[in-house]
Amino acid sequence: MKIAFFTETFLPKVDGIVTRLTKTIEFLTKNGDEVIVFCPEGCPDSYKGATIVGVAAMPLPLYPELKLGLPGPAVSDKLEEFKPDLVHVVNPAVLGLGGIWLAKTNNIPLIASYHTHLPKYLEHYGMGMLEPLLWELLKAAHNQALLNLCTSTAMVNELEDKGIQRTALWQRGVDTENFRPELRSEKMREKLFGKYQNTDSLLIYVGRLSAEKQIERIKPVLDLSL
Protein backbone atom coordinates (compact mmCIF):
# COMPACT_ATOMS: atom_id res chain seq x y z
CA MET A 1 0.00 0.00 0.00
CA LYS A 2 1.11 3.58 -0.70
CA ILE A 3 0.33 6.00 2.12
CA ALA A 4 0.71 9.79 2.20
CA PHE A 5 0.89 11.59 5.55
CA PHE A 6 0.20 15.31 6.01
CA THR A 7 1.43 16.63 9.34
CA GLU A 8 2.30 20.02 10.84
CA THR A 9 4.65 18.26 13.29
CA PHE A 10 7.62 16.13 12.31
CA LEU A 11 11.36 15.72 12.70
CA PRO A 12 13.61 17.33 13.85
CA LYS A 13 10.98 18.29 16.45
CA VAL A 14 10.58 15.65 19.14
CA ASP A 15 7.24 15.20 20.91
CA GLY A 16 4.54 12.60 21.36
CA ILE A 17 3.07 13.11 17.90
CA VAL A 18 6.44 12.80 16.17
CA THR A 19 7.29 9.68 18.18
CA ARG A 20 4.01 8.03 17.23
CA LEU A 21 4.46 8.96 13.57
CA THR A 22 8.06 7.78 13.33
CA LYS A 23 7.19 4.45 14.94
CA THR A 24 4.22 4.08 12.57
CA ILE A 25 6.37 4.89 9.54
CA GLU A 26 9.05 2.46 10.66
CA PHE A 27 6.44 -0.30 11.01
CA LEU A 28 4.84 0.43 7.64
CA THR A 29 8.07 0.53 5.64
CA LYS A 30 9.38 -2.56 7.41
CA ASN A 31 6.28 -4.42 6.23
CA GLY A 32 6.59 -3.34 2.61
CA ASP A 33 4.37 -0.26 2.45
CA GLU A 34 5.51 2.88 0.61
CA VAL A 35 5.26 6.12 2.59
CA ILE A 36 5.56 9.81 1.79
CA VAL A 37 5.30 12.54 4.44
CA PHE A 38 4.43 16.19 3.78
CA CYS A 39 5.52 18.40 6.69
CA PRO A 40 7.03 21.84 7.47
CA GLU A 41 10.45 22.61 6.01
CA GLY A 42 13.60 21.84 7.99
CA CYS A 43 12.89 18.11 8.01
CA PRO A 44 15.22 15.34 6.77
CA ASP A 45 14.82 14.17 3.16
CA SER A 46 13.97 10.63 4.23
CA TYR A 47 13.27 8.51 7.29
CA LYS A 48 13.41 4.71 7.55
CA GLY A 49 12.69 4.30 3.85
CA ALA A 50 9.95 6.95 3.70
CA THR A 51 10.24 10.04 1.49
CA ILE A 52 9.92 13.31 3.42
CA VAL A 53 8.79 16.46 1.60
CA GLY A 54 9.28 19.77 3.40
CA VAL A 55 6.99 22.68 2.56
CA ALA A 56 7.25 26.38 3.37
CA ALA A 57 5.89 27.11 6.84
CA MET A 58 5.25 29.87 9.35
CA PRO A 59 5.24 29.64 13.18
CA LEU A 60 1.91 29.77 14.99
CA PRO A 61 1.85 33.15 16.85
CA LEU A 62 0.62 31.73 20.19
CA TYR A 63 2.73 28.61 19.91
CA PRO A 64 5.93 29.26 17.90
CA GLU A 65 7.14 25.68 18.34
CA LEU A 66 4.36 24.64 15.97
CA LYS A 67 4.83 25.60 12.33
CA LEU A 68 1.93 25.75 9.92
CA GLY A 69 2.82 24.34 6.52
CA LEU A 70 1.64 26.25 3.48
CA PRO A 71 0.74 23.78 0.71
CA GLY A 72 1.53 24.93 -2.81
CA PRO A 73 1.38 23.45 -6.33
CA ALA A 74 4.53 21.41 -5.68
CA VAL A 75 2.67 19.40 -3.02
CA SER A 76 -0.09 18.55 -5.47
CA ASP A 77 2.46 17.55 -8.11
CA LYS A 78 4.37 15.35 -5.69
CA LEU A 79 1.19 13.66 -4.49
CA GLU A 80 0.06 12.99 -8.06
CA GLU A 81 3.46 11.50 -8.84
CA PHE A 82 3.32 9.26 -5.74
CA LYS A 83 -0.27 8.09 -6.43
CA PRO A 84 -1.20 7.09 -2.86
CA ASP A 85 -3.82 4.50 -1.96
CA LEU A 86 -4.55 6.35 1.28
CA VAL A 87 -4.08 9.85 2.71
CA HIS A 88 -3.64 10.26 6.48
CA VAL A 89 -3.98 13.82 7.79
CA VAL A 90 -2.53 14.37 11.26
CA ASN A 91 -4.19 17.17 13.28
CA PRO A 92 -5.74 18.99 10.29
CA ALA A 93 -4.49 22.59 10.21
CA VAL A 94 -3.29 24.57 7.18
CA LEU A 95 -1.19 21.82 5.60
CA GLY A 96 -3.71 19.24 6.76
CA LEU A 97 -6.57 21.08 5.10
CA GLY A 98 -4.54 21.00 1.90
CA GLY A 99 -4.21 17.25 2.33
CA ILE A 100 -7.96 16.89 2.83
CA TRP A 101 -8.68 18.93 -0.29
CA LEU A 102 -6.21 16.94 -2.39
CA ALA A 103 -7.61 13.62 -1.15
CA LYS A 104 -11.17 14.68 -1.90
CA THR A 105 -10.47 16.15 -5.34
CA ASN A 106 -8.47 13.07 -6.35
CA ASN A 107 -10.92 10.55 -4.83
CA ILE A 108 -8.28 9.11 -2.50
CA PRO A 109 -9.53 7.44 0.71
CA LEU A 110 -8.90 9.77 3.66
CA ILE A 111 -8.35 9.18 7.36
CA ALA A 112 -7.46 11.76 10.01
CA SER A 113 -6.08 11.62 13.53
CA TYR A 114 -6.55 13.92 16.52
CA HIS A 115 -3.54 14.41 18.80
CA THR A 116 -3.16 18.02 20.00
CA HIS A 117 -6.17 19.31 21.94
CA LEU A 118 -6.06 22.75 20.31
CA PRO A 119 -9.37 24.06 21.75
CA LYS A 120 -7.96 23.70 25.27
CA TYR A 121 -4.78 25.50 24.20
CA LEU A 122 -6.91 28.58 23.50
CA GLU A 123 -8.21 28.49 27.06
CA HIS A 124 -4.71 28.34 28.54
CA TYR A 125 -3.49 31.20 26.37
CA GLY A 126 -6.36 33.56 27.17
CA MET A 127 -8.42 33.04 24.00
CA GLY A 128 -11.15 30.76 25.31
CA MET A 129 -13.84 32.79 23.55
CA LEU A 130 -12.65 31.33 20.24
CA GLU A 131 -13.05 27.71 21.38
CA PRO A 132 -16.58 27.17 19.93
CA LEU A 133 -15.43 28.50 16.54
CA LEU A 134 -12.38 26.23 16.53
CA TRP A 135 -14.54 23.21 17.33
CA GLU A 136 -16.75 24.00 14.34
CA LEU A 137 -13.69 24.23 12.09
CA LEU A 138 -12.30 20.95 13.45
CA LYS A 139 -15.66 19.26 12.96
CA ALA A 140 -15.88 20.43 9.36
CA ALA A 141 -12.37 19.12 8.64
CA HIS A 142 -12.56 15.80 10.49
CA ASN A 143 -15.98 14.88 9.14
CA GLN A 144 -14.47 14.73 5.65
CA ALA A 145 -12.54 11.62 6.74
CA LEU A 146 -13.68 8.01 6.53
CA LEU A 147 -12.12 7.41 9.96
CA ASN A 148 -10.94 9.70 12.76
CA LEU A 149 -8.34 8.17 15.06
CA CYS A 150 -8.05 9.40 18.65
CA THR A 151 -5.27 8.71 21.13
CA SER A 152 -7.48 8.08 24.18
CA THR A 153 -11.01 6.96 25.01
CA ALA A 154 -11.58 10.36 26.65
CA MET A 155 -10.85 12.07 23.33
CA VAL A 156 -13.08 9.63 21.44
CA ASN A 157 -15.94 10.59 23.75
CA GLU A 158 -15.25 14.33 23.58
CA LEU A 159 -14.96 14.41 19.79
CA GLU A 160 -18.20 12.47 19.46
CA ASP A 161 -19.90 14.93 21.84
CA LYS A 162 -18.69 17.78 19.61
CA GLY A 163 -20.23 16.19 16.51
CA ILE A 164 -17.14 14.57 14.98
CA GLN A 165 -18.16 11.30 13.35
CA ARG A 166 -16.55 7.91 12.65
CA THR A 167 -14.12 8.01 15.57
CA ALA A 168 -11.95 5.13 16.77
CA LEU A 169 -9.27 4.58 19.39
CA TRP A 170 -5.64 4.47 18.19
CA GLN A 171 -3.98 2.85 21.18
CA ARG A 172 -0.39 3.50 22.18
CA GLY A 173 2.09 0.68 21.84
CA VAL A 174 4.78 -0.20 24.39
CA ASP A 175 8.16 -1.61 23.39
CA THR A 176 8.39 -4.49 25.85
CA GLU A 177 12.05 -5.04 25.00
CA ASN A 178 12.97 -1.61 26.36
CA PHE A 179 10.26 -1.28 29.02
CA ARG A 180 9.83 -4.32 31.29
CA PRO A 181 10.13 -5.09 35.04
CA GLU A 182 13.35 -7.06 34.56
CA LEU A 183 15.18 -3.83 33.69
CA ARG A 184 14.50 -2.29 37.12
CA SER A 185 17.70 -0.65 38.38
CA GLU A 186 18.39 0.38 41.97
CA LYS A 187 21.32 2.47 40.75
CA MET A 188 18.99 4.45 38.46
CA ARG A 189 16.48 4.91 41.29
CA GLU A 190 19.21 6.36 43.50
CA LYS A 191 20.21 8.71 40.70
CA LEU A 192 16.62 9.86 40.20
CA PHE A 193 16.01 10.40 43.91
CA GLY A 194 19.18 12.47 44.16
CA LYS A 195 19.38 14.20 47.54
CA TYR A 196 15.92 12.98 48.57
CA GLN A 197 15.21 9.87 50.60
CA ASN A 198 14.72 6.69 48.57
CA THR A 199 11.14 5.69 49.39
CA ASP A 200 8.87 3.07 47.85
CA SER A 201 7.18 5.60 45.58
CA LEU A 202 8.82 7.32 42.63
CA LEU A 203 6.83 9.46 40.22
CA ILE A 204 8.39 10.59 36.94
CA TYR A 205 6.89 13.05 34.46
CA VAL A 206 8.25 12.79 30.93
CA GLY A 207 7.06 15.56 28.65
CA ARG A 208 7.14 19.24 27.82
CA LEU A 209 6.76 21.93 30.46
CA SER A 210 3.97 24.10 29.09
CA ALA A 211 0.70 25.57 30.37
CA GLU A 212 -1.61 23.19 28.51
CA LYS A 213 0.01 20.14 30.15
CA GLN A 214 -1.52 21.20 33.49
CA ILE A 215 1.21 19.52 35.50
CA GLU A 216 0.13 21.50 38.56
CA ARG A 217 -3.01 19.35 38.79
CA ILE A 218 -0.98 16.50 40.25
CA LYS A 219 0.05 18.47 43.36
CA PRO A 220 -3.21 17.94 45.32
CA VAL A 221 -2.92 14.20 44.66
CA LEU A 222 0.67 14.18 45.90
CA ASP A 223 -0.33 16.13 49.00
CA LEU A 224 -2.95 13.50 49.82
CA SER A 225 -0.52 10.61 49.32
CA LEU A 226 2.18 12.00 51.63
Q: What feature does the model see in each segment?
A:
Residues Q171-P181:
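Short beta-strand->alpha-helix junction loop in the catalytic core
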Residues R180-Y196:
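A short helix/loop element that forms part of the nucleotide-sugar donor recognition site in Leloir-type
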